């Protein structure tokens, strides 16, 4: 029978777990590596209560963020179409391309809402016309918005 020690991780440890996880490890691993490196502490009843309280707070925070994302999605989809003006060459081909930063700036101007440009997915836009952009607001909340590229 192998003895195991219960620890609560204080930092992320590769191949073991994330900060706040309750893990069972060999006593030598705990005594010689995890505890001296301040990567974990012994799982006492008080620490387990703290961990549970932190998890509940994180759960509540995630629910609030998701609710805010849903509200932001509704307001973004009410906007309809965003107009982005670009210089045009022959055959309605635009100079450069429309970037996610351009879309984020257009959203900021139209709705005064900050949107992270890294969450915006747009197709390759090289000509004038109407395109669909997908904006990821939360892990499972995505808004669709029309982008109209017009000549400046």
UniProtKB/Swiss-Prot annotation:
Keywords: Ribonucleoprotein, Ribosomal protein, RNA-binding, rRNA-binding. It holds the Pfam family Ribosomal_L9_C. Gene3D superfamilies: Ribosomal protein L9, C-terminal domain (3.10.430.100), Ribosomal protein L9, N-terminal domain (3.40.5.10). GO terms for biological process: translation. One of its GO terms (molecular function) is structural constituent of ribosome. One of its GO terms (cellular component) is ribonucleoprotein complex. InterPro entries: Ribosomal_bL9 (IPR000244), Ribosomal_bL9/RNase_H1_N (IPR009027), Ribosomal_bL9_bac/chp (IPR020594), Ribosomal_bL9_C (IPR020069), Ribosomal_bL9_C_sf (IPR036791), Ribosomal_bL9_N (IPR020070), Ribosomal_bL9_N_sf (IPR036935). It comes from the Bacteria. PROSITE patterns: RIBOSOMAL_L9. Binds to the 23S rRNA. NCBIfam families: L9 (TIGR00158). Belongs to the bacterial ribosomal protein bL9 family. This is Large ribosomal subunit protein bL9. The lineage of its organism: Bacteria, Bacillati, Cyanobacteriota, Cyanophyceae, Nostocales. The gene is rplI.
């Amino acid at each position: 029978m192998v003895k195991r020690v219960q620890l609560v991780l204080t930092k992320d440890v590769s191949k073991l777990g994330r900060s706040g996880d309750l893990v069972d490890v060999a006593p030598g691993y705990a005594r010689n590596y995890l505890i001296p490196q301040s990567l974990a502490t012994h799982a006492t009843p008080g620490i387990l209560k703290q961990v549970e309280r932190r998890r509940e707070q994180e759960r509540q925070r995630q629910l609030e963020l998701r609710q805010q994302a849903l509200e932001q999605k509704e307001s973004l989809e009410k906007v309809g179409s965003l107009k982005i003006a670009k210089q045009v060459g022959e055959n309605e081909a635009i100079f450069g391309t429309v970037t996610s930063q351009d879309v984020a700036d257009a959203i900021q101007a139209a709705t005064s809402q900050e949107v992270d440009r890294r969450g915006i997915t747009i197709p390759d836009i090289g000509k004038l016309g109407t395109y669909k952009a997908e904006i990821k607001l939360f892990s499972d909340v995505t808004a669709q918005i029309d982008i109209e590229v017009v000549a400046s």
